[in-house]
């Protein structure tokens, strides 16, 4: 029973995706819950999974919660909070050993889905609100994470560039929320937001392991208590065009190394037929150590401590990040723009294309060895409403032509230049 694709169903408004396979010694369970990014909900929503991991109605104390995982032969439980396009995503993960390797009284897959369902839908409450001591502790945890961004100047500059570029868009928001909102959060108002979140989230539950779709549907139906059967779908916003004039932002801090970041707009997203071409184009521009930015800005000209580019296909944005000597701003900016212009003019070597395709191919092939990576690639398709199995992505990338790469690069338009510096410097 080794299938390469996911079988799909739906129960309680939850989309269920199962890959029956005996390849792995564990069950990989992943639950995605997405809601639109919004200023008034982003902070309480970010706090929710931190509170949920503290205890359930069945295991109200955190020590009991952790002991329950240990009793499932050391099952793992974790979560991430991040943004995907204009959505705030909360992803829960559980992994537990395959039943055939142990002699448990009850199916470990059933125990895992029951535990996850409990954690998400049946939290510990006091006076019809989240337990205040958990809210207080986790609020400080989130505060420290948000405050740590300013100490990591690479992350800080990347976030500030996006904030300036997307000033009136939800995408400007940090997925962990806003520091200014934390003090106003308590057990009552976060629980109120939790109830809305549980009812209105788009939910996708994945299982990879030695099971069947029918078994998982039955387990999810009985273990996930939800007041609604409505299945919400993601709505991907149409990418914006760059402004008529490039935004130029200079910010000063006590730093020794300048951070030059650039934001570009593209109409190409994951659902576009040109997606593979844009992926390869970004790889050639700045996605890998052999890219134009790395070899020319860093190695040949020695102008950057680091330099690279990142393509977000769920938003239609490409960002360029670099760390430079402050006095080299003009020269670095010119050479970065020169590399982009060369790519857009079709000045692309066979070596750049073949190396980039090889790097992407290796990443895709390696994903087949990880249940969670296979889940991640499949969810990309669910999110964008464009099914692209790994085999199809491999084929699409392999068949990209130099002309298609140039065409995908040519629609990149510079929107924002952000420079973090210590000097009075006009960008």
What spans do the regions from the language model cover?
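M16 family metallopeptidases and their MPP-like homologs
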Residues: 17-19, 25-38, 43-44, 62-118, ...
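Acidic/histidine-enriched alpha-helical segments
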Residues: 66, 122-146, 234-242, 338, ...
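Short, flexible, solvent-exposed loop/turn segments with mixed acidic/basic and small polar residues
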Residues: 82-83, 191-198, 309-311, 406-410
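Glycine-rich, mobile lid/loop segments that gate access to catalytic sites or pores
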Residues: 142, 148-150, 161, 165
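Active-site glycine-rich loop that binds ribose-phosphate moieties when present
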Residues: 184-191
